[in-house]
Amino acid sequence: LCTAPIHKKALQDGAGFAYPGHTEYLQALAGADRAVMMLASEQLRVVPTTIHIALRDVPKMLTPALLRDTIRITAEGLRQQFGIAQPRIAVAGLNPAEGYALRGPLPADTMFHATARASYDAAVCMYHDQALIPIKTLDFDRGVNVTLGLPFIRTSPDHGTAFDIAGTGVANPSSMIEALRMAHRMANP
């Protein structure tokens, strides 16, 4: 299933749609416990543990159970949807310089360098911007949103409706095209 961008507020306010977006709706339809957003490109795959909350709220939202669940769903998605038998997952720290001697969490300011990216298959990040800034910097026009945790493949372009450029002839279809291609590759390993 490859979905196109939707205007969430218009659906909720104008049509009475009871869900924040596609992901939550598909999760409910599928009876899935939790769906996780992965942004993927040829260069990088990232998964934010928390999404669409204020940065000041991230520390209180992060729990060992939430992080464990995010990592589990990411690993399952890498195996089932990307064909990676033994997924290597990097975990970004919220405050990695706190002084603990750990291999991970990794400092987000260096974990996205090309050499570091070669050592893992996906990065689990603590919050939305920590995950999205590197992928949009590396591959802005070809990023794909992959929903993990559903019993079927779901992709979508990594952008919104872009009403501000509708009808101007400047919209770039690359992310939608890549979302269709990635769904096809995932369905035909």
Predicted regions and their residues:
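Anion-binding alpha/beta catalytic cores of soluble intermediary-metabolism enzymes, centered on
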Residues: 1-189
